[in-house]
Design a protein with these regions (language model features):
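Glycine-rich cofactor phosphate-binding loops and adjacent beta1-alpha1 units
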Residues: 115-117, 162-237
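Mid-domain Rossmann-like dinucleotide-binding core that forms the NAD(H)/NADP(H) cofactor-binding site
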Residues: 95-172
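Short N-terminal strand-loop motif that marks the start
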Residues: 1-24, 167, 299
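Glycine-rich beta-strand-centered segment in the early N-terminal region that forms part
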Residues: 12-53, 91-93
Length: 299
């Protein structure tokens, strides 16, 4: 469960009734012979459903991807029927606690893929939440230089424990000046902004170099209205793009986990039993930004 799932519990903007949760692993109980899946096989589920596979013929530039747990019923149940294309077998070397982050890794892969980066480029990441730290780890793997910015010292410490060398706390340092020092005066070529990170977007123009690229990533569900001075964006001729899902990147995400590229230690805050959800959710909702991932054990 994530902060988005908690927002659904709180009654924010979802089309009810709906079953939340978009990340799940499980065991195959039944499978068609043509599916390639085996009974008892450990799998991770993709929440992405392509609404119209013929979108290109209709002139659309990007596919309309629905997300289970947000646009339709999700995975918070003890049994679910899934199409084979949404079911991915897990290699033996991937632990359950790592596999549960496949969806967020896929989103981070797609987000960085939307940028035309080159080795050695600086990438400022606004928010040291789970997605932000995963994106920073990927930056290192791609030989980029991540700079993670957050007001939460605990989250920054977690980022540092994951090998992120440059972290900035705006309450302790001038963000722009610190990035100038880190980049040798260039500022960041790229900035990733995840609105659910609880960071404000007003840093974007001041930390991104002229002509740089900004990617707004994550889900646009349950967000408050965010304000960004477009005059500053125009003045610096910033390129702005958006990535709201990891559709098409699940195999890459699994491969990254299998090769130990992504370290998920510290991302899971607690594990609760399925029968305890009604009691635990009110406690979690009191400060959903304090939580990375809450795992629900349905066994």
């Amino acid at each position: 469960m994530s902060s988005t799932d908690v927002a659904i519990f709180e009654g924010k903007k979802a089309s009810y009734p709906i079953i939340p949760v978009r990340s799940a692993i499980g065991l195959v109980s039944e499978a068609h012979a043509m599916s390639g899946l085996k009974k008892g096989e450990r799998v991770v589920l993709s929440p992405y459903v392509l609404d119209d596979p013929f979108y290109k013929k209709k002139g659309a530039l990007v596919p309309d991807v629905k997300v289970m747990g947000l646009d339709m019923d999700g995975f918070l149940c003890d049994f679910i029927s899934m199409p084979p294309e949404n079911v991915y077998p897990l290699p033996e070397g991937i632990k359950d606690n790592d596999a549960i982050f496949t969806e967020q890794i896929a989103l981070a892969v797609k987000s960085l893929g939307a940028l035309e980066t080159e080795r050695g480029d600086y990438v400022a990441i606004l928010g040291a939440n789970t997605l932000g730290i995963i994106a920073a780890e990927l930056c290192i793997y791609y030989q980029l230089v991540p700079i993670v910015i957050d007001v939460d010292e605990t989250k920054l410490s977690l980022a540092e424990n994951h090998g992120i060398y440059y972290t900035i706390n705006p309450s302790k340092a001038d963000v722009r000046q610190r990035i100038i020092e880190i980049t040798g005066g260039k500022l960041a070529e790229f900035t990733l902004y995840e609105p659910r990170s609880n960071m404000l977007p007003n840093y974007i123009p001041s930390i991104t170099q002229e002509g740089g690229t900004v990617a707004v990533i994550g889900y646009n569900y349950f967000l408050s209205n965010l304000q960004l001075n477009l005059g500053d964006v125009l003045e610096k001729q910033l390129n702005v793009t958006a990535v709201k899902n990891g559709y098409g990147e699940f195999n890459t995400a699994i491969n990254l986990l299998a090769n130990k590229v992504i370290n998920t230690e510290g991302f899971i805050d607690s594990v609760i039993k399925f029968d305890d959800i009604d009691r635990e959710l009110p406690r979690i909702s009191e400060d959903k930004y304090a939580y990375g991932k809450v795992v629900v054990d349905c066994m």
